[in-house]
A protein has these predicted regions:
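Outer-membrane beta-barrel porins/channels
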Residues: 1-257
Length: 257
């Protein structure tokens, strides 16, 4: 939902609804031993935690666009998501020599999130943008455990270029895109240290569909995840994706004079 409050100023809000189940299992196997009767004894411990979540989330945003001359413009934006504890039903099942099932009251939520960005546009053909976001996961309690996560930050840069808005050359209407990001994920090691950092580069094309306003997007992305602590794995990920954006006037009633 968005509202244009002034000529160049807009505000908006999003409402999201969460539902789903989370199951986490912890298992430990102890070394076997021989008792005084000569029997081999093996012990194990399995704890299963199940959570069913049903709740909502709110996002708020503001955007201001300042034209500069006839072909230039700068857009500033900011977003905010308030911290919110999610309604949930949680149980813990422990399996040793007997099975014990009990309900528990668990706290689990989403953090305060802040974001800001700036975009420069030239002649509706060149767009360059920078975004920064901060998610305060360090303030979130998970399964009644405080400080389970660390804050997540992300900075992204990107650009899109269209050679020509007019003309018959097909490749002149193709949208050429390039971007990159750097982020620090929110998960920790068992010692409470930040586990990894991540960065990626994306390149792609927006291919216009002939005699249509729809766009076919082809994208390739390289992602590098680096472990920051001893024993952590490094990951190299290569992704390819194809998508289509429909922008048709299906329900527009044509008029003939």
């Amino acid at each position: 939902l968005g509202v244009k409050v002034l000529n160049n100023l807009s505000i908006g809000a999003n409402v999201s609804y969460f539902w789903g189940d989370i199951t986490r299992t912890l298992g430990m196997v102890y070394p076997s031993y021989t008792d005084i009767y000569g029997q081999t004894v093996s012990n194990s411990y399995v704890e299963t935690t199940g959570m069913s979540v049903r709740d909502y989330k709110l996002d708020f945003g503001i955007q201001y666009t300042q034209p500069i001359g006839k072909k230039h413009s700068v857009t500033l934006g900011a977003v905010f998501t308030p911290k919110h504890n999610l309604n949930n039903d949680t149980y813990v099942q422990t399996n040793t020599s007997v099975i014990t099932v009990k309900d528990t009251i668990a706290t689990f939520g989403t953090p305060n999130c802040f974001g800001a960005g700036v975009t420069y546009k030239y002649d509706d053909r060149l767009t360059v943008g920078v975004d920064y976001s901060l998610q305060k996961w360090g303030d979130v309690t998970y399964m009644n455990q405080p400080n389970a996560f660390c804050d997540r930050t992300k900075i992204s840069v990107g650009a899109e270029y269209i050679p020509s808005k007019i003309g018959r050359n097909y490749f002149g209407h193709v949208k050429y895109r390039l971007g990159g990001y750097y982020t620090t994920p929110y998960y920790k090691t068992e010692a409470g240290e930040r586990a990894s950092r991540e960065y990626g580069v994306t390149a792609g094309f927006g291919l216009p569909v002939p005699r249509s306003r729809s766009i076919v997007s082809v994208t390739a992305q390289y992602v590098r995840v680096e472990g920051l602590q001893a024993g952590m794995l490094n990951e190299n990920i290569l992704r390819f994706s194809i998508g289509i954006t429909f922008n048709e006037r299906w329900f527009f009633k044509r008029k003939v004079d």
